[in-house]
């Protein structure tokens, strides 16, 4: 190690000064990559692949930080997606609040791990504090509820399905899956979710050994919400056939349409059949911050568990998610004790070891990002961000639904709008690809067998004038390719 190449952070003023210089140089490289506002350089994937491969993998002798940063600035940064651009709107992939970028630096510098108290004292206590606040925020009872941060919505959803499976088998069959493996009735267990729900439900069923066929896909209505009558019919038929419905998933914001299922009616059916009700609110949970739109997810407190993604509407860096449970015992399915990590006597002496609540062992201090964002913005500031996103989606929908050149099949409840030019599938595909080459990135999906385009509007800096300009450009390209 030398002053020009500090190996680790330390108390040394020389090291701190050099590291500060490295940070300044890195920021300069980032800012130099900023363009005229476009979201993407438009580079061809084959050209970009060749440029990246030319950088090499592992040199015999290190190049030093300056050289590596120079290559990064030249080859990589110009072709990064600029998520803060108002021309980036394809996915639930948000720009990030500036204070949370600073929180990521703190997280990386200290490199805390959330599995045991002695690997992250302040980090552990902060996560516990934030979880306690979150369960209250979403209407769960403070004395019985719990949760933990996860790597993303998929892990949160899978964790919920595992917990529901173990809970149901204990209640229905007096069977301990954690100790004894799968019960004889396992092949007859069924989970119910919307036909347009997130694919992590299928992934969870595969991981649990039940397979995709154990996931019953409920048809949706014209607003892309679960058809409750079809759900009730499906449950009745499955029980009559000797199957065991153990869990249902209410989607609070479908990926494409932002649709919100009728969780109140689903709760009634789950109570009737003794089922766990999970809320996949990875997308729609952000509405909890909005006085104007909060009522749209008011039924979320009726669910037994909730997935919250902070790297979507909350505008936090990837990744940051949490699973919340109304009954803290649900998370005991992940609890194991290791002599070197989470000794039982530690808990008795006040040392909290969070490894017993999670599928993961090593976990990042993601709660700090939520803390810094919440404290910086407050309910009012966050409410303005959420209201802007939902309002922009409503504005865009009103514009295109009144335009005969477009179709817009579903009125948005959140901030995503699915639409298409009336010119046919190939035209819509070409329009999206051409926009990408120009630096404007929008989404593409399918509805009823038809290729659709998609705006996912999360950026609070997006103004109506920009929306209008993109509409004009889409129409121009549509006429060109027709």
Placement of each model-derived feature along the sequence:
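PLP-dependent enzyme catalytic core of the Aspartate aminotransferase-like
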Residues: 273, 447-482
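Active-site C-terminal subdomain of aminotransferase-like
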Residues: 254, 273, 298-401
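Short loop-beta-helix segment that forms the pyridoxal 5′-phosphate
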Residues: 134-166, 216-219
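N-terminal entrance/gating region of PLP-dependent enzymes' catalytic architecture
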Residues: 2-144, 456, 462, 473-474
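Conserved PLP-enzyme active-site core in the AAT-like
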Residues: 101, 122, 156, 163-332
């Amino acid at each position: 190690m030398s002053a020009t190449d500090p190996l680790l952070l330390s108390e040394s003023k020389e090291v701190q000064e050099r590291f500060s210089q490295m940070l300044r140089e890195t920021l300069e490289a980032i800012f130099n990559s900023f363009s005229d506002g476009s979201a993407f350089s438009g580079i061809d994937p084959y050209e970009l692949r060749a440029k990246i491969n030319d950088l090499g993998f592992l040199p015999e002798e290190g190049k030093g930080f300056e050289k590596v940063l120079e290559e990064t600035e030249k080859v990589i940064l110009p072709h990064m997606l600029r998520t803060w651009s108002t021309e980036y709107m394809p996915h639930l992939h948000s720009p990030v609040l500036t204070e949370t970028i600073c929180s990521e630096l703190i997280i990386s510098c200290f490199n805390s791990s959330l599995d045991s108290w002695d690997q992250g004292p302040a980090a552990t206590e902060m996560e516990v504090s934030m979880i306690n606040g979150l369960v209250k925020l979403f209407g769960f009872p403070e004395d019985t509820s719990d949760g933990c941060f996860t790597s993303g919505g998929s892990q949160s959803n899978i964790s919920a399905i595992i917990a529901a499976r173990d809970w149901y088998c204990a209640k229905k069959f007096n069977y301990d899956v954690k100790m004894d493996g799968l019960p004889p009735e396992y092949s007859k267990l069924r989970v119910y979710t919307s036909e347009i729900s997130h694919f992590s439900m299928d992934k969870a069923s595969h991981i649990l050994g039940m397979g995709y066929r154990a996931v019953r896909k409920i048809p949706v209505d014209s607003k892309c919400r679960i058809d409750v009558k079809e759900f009730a019919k499906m449950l009745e038929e499955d029980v009559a056939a000797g199957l065991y419905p153990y869990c249902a998933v209410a989607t609070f914001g479908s990926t494409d349409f932002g649709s919100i299922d009728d969780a109140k009616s689903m709760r009634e059916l789950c109570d009737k059949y003794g089922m766990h009700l999970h809320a996949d609110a990875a997308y729609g949970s952000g509405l909890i911050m909005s006085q104007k739109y909060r009522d749209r997810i008011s039924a979320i407190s009726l669910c037994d568990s909730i997935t919250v993604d902070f790297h979507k509407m909350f505008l936090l860096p990837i990744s940051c998610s949490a699973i919340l449970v109304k009954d803290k015992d649900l998370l005991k399915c992940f609890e194991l004790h290791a002599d070197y990590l989470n000794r039982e006597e530690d808990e008795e002496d006040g040392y909290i070891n969070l490894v017993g609540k999670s599928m993961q062992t090593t976990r990042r201090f993601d709660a700090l990002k939520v803390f810094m964002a919440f404290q910086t913005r407050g309910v009012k500031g966050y409410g303005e961000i959420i209201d802007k996103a939902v309002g922009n989606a409503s504005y865009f929908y009103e514009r295109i639904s009144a335009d005969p050149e477009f179709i817009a099949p579903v009125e948005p409840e959140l901030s995503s709008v699915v639409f298409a030019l009336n010119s046919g599938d190939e035209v819509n595909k070409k329009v999206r690809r051409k926009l990408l080459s120009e630096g404007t990135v929008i989404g593409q999906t399918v509805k009823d067998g038809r290729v659709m385009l998609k705006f996912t509007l999360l950026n609070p800096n997006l103004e109506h004038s920009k929306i209008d300009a993109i509409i004009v450009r889409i129409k121009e390209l549509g006429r060109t390719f027709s």
